[in-house]
Amino acid sequence: SKWNANKILRGSASALSQDIKFSKVNYYVKKHGFSTDATIEMIEEIVNDNDIVLTAIGDCGSCCSSCIRDAVALEDRGIPAAPVITTEFVNETKLTRVAIGMPDLKPVVIDHPVSSITNDEVLERVKIIKEQAQEVWLGQRQDI
């Protein structure tokens, strides 16, 4: 995992649990690296074990692309997915969404970078994810 990504994701799950009563929070790690698409088997496992999902973190070109493609794979199977990307990859995200046939997928957008930030900056990103992920899941998020 990228430096601070785990802190951001676990912090986001904790922050979201203040508003949402999760019966369980699951974490998945791709065996072949975070910049690859999830395998069909992993997608099916996620679908079977979750009602809503964060896919993350799109903070480089390949990571952004796989984050969006994973979210689309989950959305196609009926699981609301909130892909988390950074400000540097907003345009790439728009292009990817259109190219793979889901232009209306709304991402969560946090400040770039992710790796070289302070604990206070981690908390700022967690706060943004808490707010925007709920907007995505409820269909209230405006496009980027």
Where in this protein do the model-derived segments appear?
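Metallocofactor- and cofactor-centric catalytic cores in central/energy metabolism, strongly enriched
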Residues: 1-77, 82-100, 106-144
